[in-house]
Protein backbone atom coordinates (compact mmCIF):
# COMPACT_ATOMS: atom_id res chain seq x y z
CA UNK A 1 0.00 0.00 0.00
CA UNK A 2 1.48 3.34 -1.01
CA UNK A 3 1.94 5.66 1.95
CA UNK A 4 0.62 8.60 -0.04
CA UNK A 5 -2.64 6.80 -0.77
CA UNK A 6 -3.48 5.74 2.77
CA UNK A 7 -6.26 7.76 4.41
CA UNK A 8 -5.80 6.41 7.94
CA UNK A 9 -3.06 5.94 10.53
CA UNK A 10 -0.86 2.96 9.82
CA UNK A 11 2.47 1.50 10.77
CA UNK A 12 5.22 3.90 9.79
CA UNK A 13 8.70 2.50 10.07
CA UNK A 14 11.89 3.23 8.16
CA UNK A 15 14.90 1.08 8.93
CA UNK A 16 17.81 2.37 6.88
CA UNK A 17 20.79 1.85 9.15
CA UNK A 18 21.97 0.20 12.34
CA UNK A 19 21.43 2.22 15.48
CA UNK A 20 18.14 3.74 14.36
CA UNK A 21 15.65 4.31 17.17
CA UNK A 22 12.53 2.26 16.54
CA UNK A 23 10.02 3.71 18.93
CA UNK A 24 6.33 4.28 18.45
CA UNK A 25 5.84 2.61 15.09
CA UNK A 26 2.70 0.86 16.34
CA UNK A 27 0.56 2.46 19.01
CA UNK A 28 -2.05 0.51 20.93
CA UNK A 29 -4.01 3.73 21.45
CA UNK A 30 -4.12 4.81 17.83
CA UNK A 31 -6.82 2.48 16.54
CA UNK A 32 -10.00 4.21 15.45
CA UNK A 33 -13.51 3.07 16.30
CA UNK A 34 -14.52 0.46 18.86
CA UNK A 35 -11.73 -1.56 20.50
CA UNK A 36 -11.03 -4.83 18.76
CA UNK A 37 -12.05 -8.06 20.47
CA UNK A 38 -9.14 -9.52 22.45
CA UNK A 39 -7.96 -13.00 21.47
CA UNK A 40 -5.94 -14.15 24.49
CA UNK A 41 -3.03 -16.50 23.82
CA UNK A 42 -2.21 -17.95 27.22
CA UNK A 43 -0.49 -21.33 26.89
CA UNK A 44 0.23 -23.37 30.01
CA UNK A 45 3.76 -24.16 31.13
CA UNK A 46 5.30 -26.85 28.96
CA UNK A 47 3.72 -25.64 25.71
CA UNK A 48 6.37 -24.47 23.26
CA UNK A 49 5.30 -21.22 21.60
CA UNK A 50 6.96 -18.83 19.15
CA UNK A 51 7.51 -15.12 19.83
CA UNK A 52 8.86 -11.95 18.26
CA UNK A 53 10.98 -9.80 20.58
CA UNK A 54 11.48 -6.24 19.34
CA UNK A 55 14.24 -3.97 20.62
CA UNK A 56 14.05 -0.20 20.94
CA UNK A 57 17.02 0.27 18.63
CA UNK A 58 18.27 -1.76 15.69
CA UNK A 59 21.89 -2.49 16.48
CA UNK A 60 24.03 -5.50 17.46
CA UNK A 61 24.45 -4.34 21.06
CA UNK A 62 20.74 -4.18 21.84
CA UNK A 63 20.13 -7.39 19.93
CA UNK A 64 22.72 -9.21 22.06
CA UNK A 65 21.03 -7.91 25.20
CA UNK A 66 17.64 -9.02 23.91
CA UNK A 67 19.05 -12.48 23.19
CA UNK A 68 20.31 -12.68 26.77
CA UNK A 69 16.91 -11.58 28.06
CA UNK A 70 15.34 -14.39 26.02
CA UNK A 71 17.60 -17.06 27.48
CA UNK A 72 17.32 -15.63 31.01
CA UNK A 73 13.52 -15.84 30.64
CA UNK A 74 13.69 -19.53 29.75
CA UNK A 75 13.56 -19.15 26.00
CA UNK A 76 15.63 -20.24 23.03
CA UNK A 77 16.88 -17.80 20.41
CA UNK A 78 15.81 -19.15 17.02
CA UNK A 79 16.98 -16.29 14.80
CA UNK A 80 18.11 -12.73 15.33
CA UNK A 81 17.86 -9.89 12.86
CA UNK A 82 20.05 -7.11 14.32
CA UNK A 83 19.50 -5.00 11.22
CA UNK A 84 15.94 -4.37 12.40
CA UNK A 85 16.13 -5.17 16.10
CA UNK A 86 14.01 -8.33 16.00
CA UNK A 87 14.69 -11.62 17.77
CA UNK A 88 12.63 -14.74 17.02
CA UNK A 89 12.36 -16.91 20.12
CA UNK A 90 10.67 -20.07 21.35
CA UNK A 91 9.77 -20.86 24.94
CA UNK A 92 7.68 -23.31 26.95
CA UNK A 93 7.29 -20.86 29.86
CA UNK A 94 3.81 -19.47 30.35
CA UNK A 95 5.24 -16.23 31.76
CA UNK A 96 7.82 -15.79 29.01
CA UNK A 97 6.44 -12.52 27.61
CA UNK A 98 6.35 -10.78 30.97
CA UNK A 99 9.67 -12.20 32.10
CA UNK A 100 11.58 -11.23 28.96
CA UNK A 101 10.34 -7.66 29.34
CA UNK A 102 11.65 -7.59 32.90
CA UNK A 103 14.98 -9.17 31.96
CA UNK A 104 15.37 -6.79 29.04
CA UNK A 105 13.74 -3.75 30.61
CA UNK A 106 16.11 -1.23 29.02
CA UNK A 107 16.15 -2.94 25.64
CA UNK A 108 12.95 -4.83 24.84
CA UNK A 109 10.24 -2.65 23.34
CA UNK A 110 7.56 -5.29 22.70
CA UNK A 111 6.97 -9.05 22.71
CA UNK A 112 4.26 -10.98 20.92
CA UNK A 113 3.18 -14.55 20.30
CA UNK A 114 3.25 -15.38 16.59
CA UNK A 115 0.63 -18.13 16.62
CA UNK A 116 -2.16 -19.45 18.82
CA UNK A 117 -1.08 -23.09 18.95
CA UNK A 118 1.99 -25.01 20.01
CA UNK A 119 4.99 -24.92 17.71
CA UNK A 120 5.54 -27.95 15.51
CA UNK A 121 8.80 -26.65 14.08
CA UNK A 122 10.73 -26.64 17.36
CA UNK A 123 14.28 -25.46 16.83
CA UNK A 124 17.45 -26.95 18.27
CA UNK A 125 21.06 -25.97 17.69
CA UNK A 126 22.58 -22.51 17.28
CA UNK A 127 21.45 -20.03 14.67
CA UNK A 128 23.73 -19.21 11.76
CA UNK A 129 26.23 -16.37 12.29
CA UNK A 130 24.87 -12.89 11.80
CA UNK A 131 25.33 -11.14 8.52
CA UNK A 132 24.15 -11.41 4.94
CA UNK A 133 24.94 -14.34 2.75
CA UNK A 134 26.52 -13.79 -0.63
CA UNK A 135 24.49 -14.13 -3.78
CA UNK A 136 25.33 -16.87 -6.21
CA UNK A 137 24.89 -14.41 -9.07
CA UNK A 138 27.65 -12.13 -10.30
CA UNK A 139 27.31 -8.22 -10.49
CA UNK A 140 -2.29 -32.03 7.69
CA UNK A 141 -4.89 -29.79 6.82
CA UNK A 142 -3.56 -28.10 3.82
CA UNK A 143 -5.02 -24.62 4.20
CA UNK A 144 -5.39 -22.94 0.78
CA UNK A 145 -2.87 -20.13 0.63
CA UNK A 146 -4.74 -16.81 0.89
CA UNK A 147 -8.05 -18.63 0.30
CA UNK A 148 -7.44 -19.20 -3.41
CA UNK A 149 -9.61 -21.60 -5.38
CA UNK A 150 -8.41 -25.14 -6.30
CA UNK A 151 -6.34 -25.76 -9.42
CA UNK A 152 -7.92 -26.98 -12.67
CA UNK A 153 -5.36 -29.06 -14.66
CA UNK A 154 -4.80 -28.09 -18.30
CA UNK A 155 -2.96 -30.32 -20.82
CA UNK A 156 -0.12 -28.87 -22.91
CA UNK A 157 1.51 -30.08 -26.12
CA UNK A 158 3.92 -28.53 -28.59
CA UNK A 159 5.98 -25.33 -28.66
CA UNK A 160 4.68 -22.72 -26.16
CA UNK A 161 1.33 -24.22 -27.10
CA UNK A 162 -0.61 -22.52 -24.33
CA UNK A 163 0.57 -18.97 -24.94
CA UNK A 164 -2.52 -18.28 -27.04
CA UNK A 165 -4.70 -19.01 -23.99
CA UNK A 166 -2.96 -16.39 -21.84
CA UNK A 167 -5.57 -13.63 -22.07
CA UNK A 168 -4.04 -12.16 -18.94
CA UNK A 169 -0.83 -11.27 -20.77
CA UNK A 170 -2.82 -9.49 -23.46
CA UNK A 171 -4.81 -7.53 -20.87
CA UNK A 172 -1.67 -6.09 -19.28
CA UNK A 173 0.11 -5.76 -22.66
CA UNK A 174 2.93 -8.08 -21.63
CA UNK A 175 2.93 -9.57 -25.13
CA UNK A 176 3.74 -6.13 -26.54
CA UNK A 177 6.31 -5.43 -23.83
CA UNK A 178 8.17 -8.58 -24.88
CA UNK A 179 8.87 -6.95 -28.23
CA UNK A 180 11.01 -4.51 -26.24
CA UNK A 181 12.48 -6.86 -23.62
CA UNK A 182 11.87 -10.21 -21.95
CA UNK A 183 13.69 -8.92 -18.87
CA UNK A 184 17.27 -8.93 -17.66
CA UNK A 185 19.21 -11.80 -16.08
CA UNK A 186 20.48 -9.22 -13.61
CA UNK A 187 17.00 -8.96 -12.09
CA UNK A 188 16.09 -11.42 -9.34
CA UNK A 189 12.52 -11.93 -8.11
CA UNK A 190 11.90 -13.58 -4.74
CA UNK A 191 8.78 -15.73 -4.71
CA UNK A 192 7.74 -15.80 -1.05
CA UNK A 193 5.41 -18.76 -1.23
CA UNK A 194 5.10 -22.55 -0.90
CA UNK A 195 8.15 -23.41 -3.01
CA UNK A 196 8.87 -23.72 -6.73
CA UNK A 197 9.19 -26.99 -8.64
CA UNK A 198 12.81 -26.85 -9.90
CA UNK A 199 12.19 -29.54 -12.51
CA UNK A 200 9.36 -27.83 -14.36
CA UNK A 201 10.47 -27.30 -17.98
CA UNK A 202 9.07 -23.77 -18.00
CA UNK A 203 10.88 -22.78 -14.79
CA UNK A 204 14.09 -24.75 -14.34
CA UNK A 205 16.27 -22.43 -16.43
CA UNK A 206 15.17 -19.38 -14.44
CA UNK A 207 15.47 -20.68 -10.86
CA UNK A 208 18.44 -19.34 -8.92
CA UNK A 209 19.26 -22.24 -6.61
CA UNK A 210 22.01 -20.32 -4.81
CA UNK A 211 19.56 -17.68 -3.59
CA UNK A 212 16.64 -19.98 -2.75
CA UNK A 213 15.85 -20.78 0.88
CA UNK A 214 13.41 -22.40 3.28
CA UNK A 215 12.14 -20.05 6.02
CA UNK A 216 9.65 -22.46 7.62
CA UNK A 217 12.10 -23.97 10.13
CA UNK A 218 10.92 -21.71 12.92
CA UNK A 219 11.79 -18.61 10.91
CA UNK A 220 15.44 -19.54 10.49
CA UNK A 221 16.82 -19.47 6.91
CA UNK A 222 17.77 -22.96 5.75
CA UNK A 223 19.45 -23.66 2.42
CA UNK A 224 19.53 -27.43 2.80
CA UNK A 225 19.08 -29.18 -0.53
CA UNK A 226 15.41 -29.51 -1.39
CA UNK A 227 14.18 -27.51 1.59
CA UNK A 228 12.66 -24.84 -0.63
CA UNK A 229 10.92 -27.34 -2.93
CA UNK A 230 7.11 -27.53 -2.85
CA UNK A 231 5.70 -30.31 -0.68
CA UNK A 232 1.96 -30.02 -0.13
CA UNK A 233 1.00 -27.07 -2.35
CA UNK A 234 1.21 -26.11 -6.03
CA UNK A 235 0.64 -22.45 -5.18
CA UNK A 236 4.22 -21.19 -5.39
CA UNK A 237 4.91 -22.99 -8.66
CA UNK A 238 1.80 -21.43 -10.21
CA UNK A 239 2.77 -17.96 -9.01
CA UNK A 240 6.33 -18.41 -10.31
CA UNK A 241 5.12 -19.30 -13.80
CA UNK A 242 3.07 -16.12 -14.07
CA UNK A 243 6.11 -14.06 -13.14
CA UNK A 244 8.79 -15.72 -15.23
CA UNK A 245 7.90 -18.88 -17.14
CA UNK A 246 10.62 -19.05 -19.79
CA UNK A 247 10.19 -18.47 -23.50
CA UNK A 248 11.59 -21.89 -24.29
CA UNK A 249 9.15 -23.74 -26.50
CA UNK A 250 7.25 -25.27 -23.60
CA UNK A 251 3.78 -24.39 -22.34
CA UNK A 252 3.38 -20.74 -21.38
CA UNK A 253 5.35 -17.50 -21.20
CA UNK A 254 5.57 -15.40 -18.03
CA UNK A 255 5.35 -11.63 -17.68
CA UNK A 256 9.16 -11.39 -17.43
CA UNK A 257 10.42 -14.62 -19.03
CA UNK A 258 14.14 -13.83 -18.84
CA UNK A 259 14.51 -12.73 -15.20
CA UNK A 260 15.66 -15.06 -12.44
CA UNK A 261 13.51 -16.52 -9.68
CA UNK A 262 14.43 -17.39 -6.11
CA UNK A 263 12.19 -19.76 -4.19
CA UNK A 264 11.75 -18.31 -0.70
CA UNK A 265 9.58 -20.84 1.06
CA UNK A 266 7.37 -19.23 3.71
CA UNK A 267 4.41 -21.65 3.63
CA UNK A 268 4.66 -24.73 5.85
CA UNK A 269 3.23 -28.14 5.04
CA UNK A 270 -0.04 -27.26 6.79
CA UNK A 271 -0.45 -24.18 4.59
CA UNK A 272 0.37 -21.56 7.22
CA UNK A 273 2.53 -18.49 6.76
CA UNK A 274 3.52 -17.50 10.28
CA UNK A 275 5.07 -14.07 10.96
CA UNK A 276 8.56 -15.39 11.63
CA UNK A 277 8.54 -17.06 8.20
CA UNK A 278 7.59 -13.82 6.45
CA UNK A 279 10.17 -11.79 8.40
CA UNK A 280 12.80 -14.32 7.35
CA UNK A 281 11.63 -14.05 3.75
CA UNK A 282 11.83 -10.26 3.55
CA UNK A 283 15.18 -10.17 5.32
CA UNK A 284 16.59 -12.90 3.08
CA UNK A 285 15.42 -11.05 -0.02
CA UNK A 286 17.24 -7.92 1.12
CA UNK A 287 20.40 -9.70 2.17
CA UNK A 288 20.64 -11.54 -1.13
CA UNK A 289 20.15 -8.45 -3.25
CA UNK A 290 16.77 -9.31 -4.73
CA UNK A 291 15.00 -6.66 -6.76
CA UNK A 292 11.35 -7.69 -6.38
CA UNK A 293 9.33 -9.94 -4.10
CA UNK A 294 5.88 -11.37 -4.65
CA UNK A 295 3.69 -12.02 -1.62
CA UNK A 296 0.51 -13.91 -2.50
CA UNK A 297 -0.64 -14.58 1.06
CA UNK A 298 -1.76 -13.03 4.30
CA UNK A 299 0.23 -13.72 7.43
CA UNK A 300 -1.40 -16.28 9.71
CA UNK A 301 -3.03 -16.88 12.08
CA UNK A 302 -4.91 -13.56 11.92
CA UNK A 303 -6.45 -12.27 8.73
CA UNK A 304 -6.27 -8.83 10.36
CA UNK A 305 -3.64 -7.88 12.95
CA UNK A 306 -4.85 -5.24 15.42
CA UNK A 307 -2.62 -2.57 16.92
CA UNK A 308 -4.69 -2.38 20.12
CA UNK A 309 -3.79 -6.00 20.97
CA UNK A 310 -0.23 -6.34 22.37
CA UNK A 311 0.68 -9.65 20.73
CA UNK A 312 -0.64 -8.58 17.35
CA UNK A 313 0.93 -5.12 17.57
CA UNK A 314 4.35 -6.62 18.28
CA UNK A 315 4.06 -8.90 15.27
CA UNK A 316 3.00 -6.03 13.01
CA UNK A 317 5.99 -4.07 14.22
CA UNK A 318 8.41 -6.89 13.37
CA UNK A 319 6.92 -7.43 9.91
CA UNK A 320 6.89 -3.69 9.14
CA UNK A 321 10.54 -3.41 10.12
CA UNK A 322 11.45 -6.31 7.81
CA UNK A 323 9.47 -4.88 4.89
CA UNK A 324 10.93 -1.42 5.34
CA UNK A 325 14.49 -2.66 5.70
CA UNK A 326 14.13 -4.69 2.52
CA UNK A 327 12.83 -1.60 0.73
CA UNK A 328 15.77 0.43 2.02
CA UNK A 329 18.03 -2.23 0.53
CA UNK A 330 16.42 -1.92 -2.90
CA UNK A 331 13.61 -4.49 -2.84
CA UNK A 332 10.14 -3.58 -4.12
CA UNK A 333 7.28 -5.83 -3.02
CA UNK A 334 3.87 -6.69 -4.45
CA UNK A 335 1.15 -8.37 -2.40
CA UNK A 336 -2.29 -9.88 -2.89
CA UNK A 337 -5.15 -7.75 -1.55
CA UNK A 338 -6.99 -10.80 -0.17
CA UNK A 339 -9.92 -12.96 -1.17
CA UNK A 340 -12.67 -12.10 1.32
CA UNK A 341 -14.57 -9.68 -0.93
CA UNK A 342 -14.22 -6.97 1.70
CA UNK A 343 -13.95 -3.22 1.55
CA UNK A 344 -10.80 -2.77 3.61
CA UNK A 345 -11.75 0.80 4.56
CA UNK A 346 -14.89 -0.15 6.49
CA UNK A 347 -14.43 -3.75 7.58
CA UNK A 348 -15.53 -4.35 11.19
CA UNK A 349 -15.65 -8.16 11.54
CA UNK A 350 -13.19 -11.04 11.34
CA UNK A 351 -14.94 -14.39 11.63
CA UNK A 352 -12.06 -16.76 10.85
CA UNK A 353 -9.15 -15.86 13.10
CA UNK A 354 -7.00 -17.26 14.53
CA UNK A 355 -7.09 -19.76 11.68
CA UNK A 356 -4.65 -22.19 13.29
CA UNK A 357 -6.98 -22.77 16.25
CA UNK A 358 -9.49 -25.60 16.43
CA UNK A 359 -12.22 -22.96 16.74
CA UNK A 360 -11.67 -19.38 15.52
CA UNK A 361 -12.85 -16.45 17.63
CA UNK A 362 -15.36 -14.26 15.76
CA UNK A 363 -14.36 -10.74 16.65
CA UNK A 364 -14.92 -7.06 16.18
CA UNK A 365 -12.09 -5.27 14.42
CA UNK A 366 -11.44 -1.61 13.65
CA UNK A 367 -9.35 0.52 11.33
CA UNK A 368 -6.30 -0.23 13.45
CA UNK A 369 -6.54 -3.84 12.25
CA UNK A 370 -4.63 -4.60 9.06
CA UNK A 371 -4.10 -7.40 6.58
CA UNK A 372 -0.33 -7.91 6.41
CA UNK A 373 1.79 -7.67 4.37
CA UNK A 374 -0.73 -6.17 1.91
CA UNK A 375 -1.50 -3.17 4.12
CA UNK A 376 2.07 -2.42 5.16
CA UNK A 377 2.99 1.01 3.73
CA UNK A 378 5.20 0.79 0.67
CA UNK A 379 3.91 -2.61 -0.43
CA UNK A 380 2.02 -2.60 -3.75
CA UNK A 381 -1.48 -3.93 -3.01
CA UNK A 382 -3.10 -5.75 -5.93
CA UNK A 383 -6.80 -6.42 -6.64
CA UNK A 384 -7.99 -9.21 -8.96
CA UNK A 385 -9.81 -8.90 -12.29
CA UNK A 386 -11.79 -11.26 -14.50
CA UNK A 387 -11.21 -11.81 -18.22
CA UNK A 388 -13.74 -9.08 -19.03
CA UNK A 389 -12.03 -6.58 -16.75
CA UNK A 390 -14.48 -6.69 -13.85
CA UNK A 391 -13.33 -6.92 -10.26
CA UNK A 392 -13.31 -10.59 -9.27
CA UNK A 393 -16.14 -11.29 -6.83
CA UNK A 394 -13.70 -12.56 -4.20
CA UNK A 395 -11.27 -9.64 -4.38
CA UNK A 396 -10.83 -7.27 -1.48
CA UNK A 397 -11.20 -3.63 -2.40
CA UNK A 398 -11.10 -0.17 -0.86
CA UNK A 399 -10.42 3.43 -1.87
CA UNK A 400 -6.84 4.25 -0.95
CA UNK A 401 -6.14 0.60 -0.14
CA UNK A 402 -5.81 -0.86 -3.66
CA UNK A 403 -2.81 0.39 -5.64
CA UNK A 404 -3.36 -1.38 -8.97
CA UNK A 405 -5.42 -4.23 -10.42
CA UNK A 406 -4.36 -7.23 -12.51
CA UNK A 407 -5.85 -10.46 -13.89
CA UNK A 408 -6.60 -13.03 -11.18
CA UNK A 409 -9.55 -15.20 -12.24
CA UNK A 410 -8.86 -18.54 -13.96
CA UNK A 411 -5.21 -17.80 -14.64
CA UNK A 412 -3.23 -20.39 -16.57
CA UNK A 413 0.22 -21.16 -15.20
CA UNK A 414 2.69 -23.84 -14.17
CA UNK A 415 2.05 -26.50 -11.52
CA UNK A 416 4.40 -29.23 -10.25
CA UNK A 417 5.19 -32.25 -12.34
CA UNK A 418 5.68 -30.35 -15.58
CA UNK A 419 1.97 -29.60 -15.74
CA UNK A 420 -0.26 -26.55 -16.15
CA UNK A 421 -3.43 -25.45 -14.40
CA UNK A 422 -5.98 -22.71 -13.86
CA UNK A 423 -6.17 -20.97 -10.49
CA UNK A 424 -8.16 -18.00 -9.22
CA UNK A 425 -7.38 -15.55 -6.45
CA UNK A 426 -5.70 -12.25 -5.72
CA UNK A 427 -2.69 -14.55 -5.34
CA UNK A 428 -2.78 -14.87 -9.12
CA UNK A 429 -3.12 -11.10 -9.65
CA UNK A 430 -0.11 -10.10 -7.55
CA UNK A 431 2.51 -12.02 -9.59
CA UNK A 432 1.43 -10.16 -12.72
CA UNK A 433 2.45 -6.98 -10.93
CA UNK A 434 5.67 -8.53 -9.62
CA UNK A 435 6.48 -9.51 -13.20
CA UNK A 436 5.79 -6.00 -14.47
CA UNK A 437 8.03 -4.57 -11.75
CA UNK A 438 10.74 -7.01 -12.85
CA UNK A 439 10.41 -5.84 -16.46
CA UNK A 440 10.50 -2.25 -15.28
CA UNK A 441 13.63 -2.85 -13.21
CA UNK A 442 15.20 -4.54 -16.24
CA UNK A 443 14.51 -1.54 -18.46
CA UNK A 444 15.22 1.07 -15.77
CA UNK A 445 17.80 -0.41 -13.36
CA UNK A 446 18.50 3.00 -11.84
CA UNK A 447 15.03 3.31 -10.27
CA UNK A 448 14.60 2.91 -6.51
CA UNK A 449 11.70 0.92 -5.02
CA UNK A 450 9.73 4.12 -4.41
CA UNK A 451 10.37 5.26 -7.98
CA UNK A 452 9.34 1.88 -9.35
CA UNK A 453 6.06 2.06 -7.44
CA UNK A 454 5.42 5.61 -8.62
CA UNK A 455 6.05 4.64 -12.24
CA UNK A 456 3.87 1.54 -11.86
CA UNK A 457 0.98 3.69 -10.68
CA UNK A 458 1.59 6.42 -13.25
CA UNK A 459 1.74 3.85 -16.06
CA UNK A 460 -1.38 1.94 -15.01
CA UNK A 461 -4.34 2.18 -17.38
CA UNK A 462 -7.02 4.33 -15.68
CA UNK A 463 -10.24 2.36 -15.44
CA UNK A 464 -13.64 3.72 -14.49
CA UNK A 465 -15.75 2.05 -11.84
CA UNK A 466 -17.70 -1.00 -12.97
CA UNK A 467 -20.55 -2.88 -11.37
CA UNK A 468 -19.41 -5.51 -8.85
CA UNK A 469 -19.24 -8.99 -10.34
CA UNK A 470 -22.47 -10.89 -9.60
CA UNK A 471 -23.58 -7.75 -7.72
CA UNK A 472 -21.58 -8.94 -4.71
CA UNK A 473 -19.61 -6.81 -2.29
CA UNK A 474 -19.20 -3.08 -1.81
CA UNK A 475 -19.76 -0.91 -4.88
CA UNK A 476 -16.91 0.90 -6.57
CA UNK A 477 -16.24 4.49 -5.54
CA UNK A 478 -13.79 7.03 -6.91
CA UNK A 479 -12.57 8.33 -10.25
CA UNK A 480 -11.03 6.52 -13.23
CA UNK A 481 -7.63 7.71 -12.00
CA UNK A 482 -8.10 6.34 -8.47
CA UNK A 483 -10.94 4.16 -7.23
CA UNK A 484 -11.70 1.36 -4.82
CA UNK A 485 -11.67 -1.46 -7.40
CA UNK A 486 -8.76 -0.68 -9.71
CA UNK A 487 -6.68 1.67 -7.60
CA UNK A 488 -4.62 3.70 -10.07
CA UNK A 489 -5.71 1.36 -12.86
CA UNK A 490 -4.85 -1.90 -14.61
CA UNK A 491 -1.13 -2.61 -14.54
CA UNK A 492 0.56 -1.96 -17.91
CA UNK A 493 3.68 -3.93 -18.86
CA UNK A 494 4.30 -2.10 -22.14
CA UNK A 495 4.57 1.30 -20.48
CA UNK A 496 6.79 -0.24 -17.81
CA UNK A 497 9.56 -0.90 -20.32
CA UNK A 498 9.29 2.48 -22.07
Question: Predicted regions span which residues?
Answer:
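Active-site alpha-helical elements of protease catalytic centers
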Residues: 185-188, 192, 221-265, 274, ...
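Secretory targeting and sorting signals
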Residues: 1-31
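Active-site core segment of subtilase-fold serine proteases
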Residues: 137-257, 280, 287-314, 345, ...
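C-terminal subdomain of the subtilisin-like protease fold in secreted/lumenal serine endopeptidases
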Residues: 31-44, 78, 117, 290-297, ...
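Loop/turn elements at helix/coil->beta-strand transitions in domains of secreted/extracellular proteins
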Residues: 106-108, 184-188, 257-262, 287-293, ...
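Substrate-binding/access-modulating region of protease and related hydrolase catalytic domains
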Residues: 266-373, 416-431, 482-483
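Extracellular S/T/G-rich loop segment that most often corresponds to the catalytic His/Ser-adjacent loop
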Residues: 331, 356-442, 446, 454, ...
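Autoinhibitory propeptides
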Residues: 3, 39-40, 57-60, 64-163
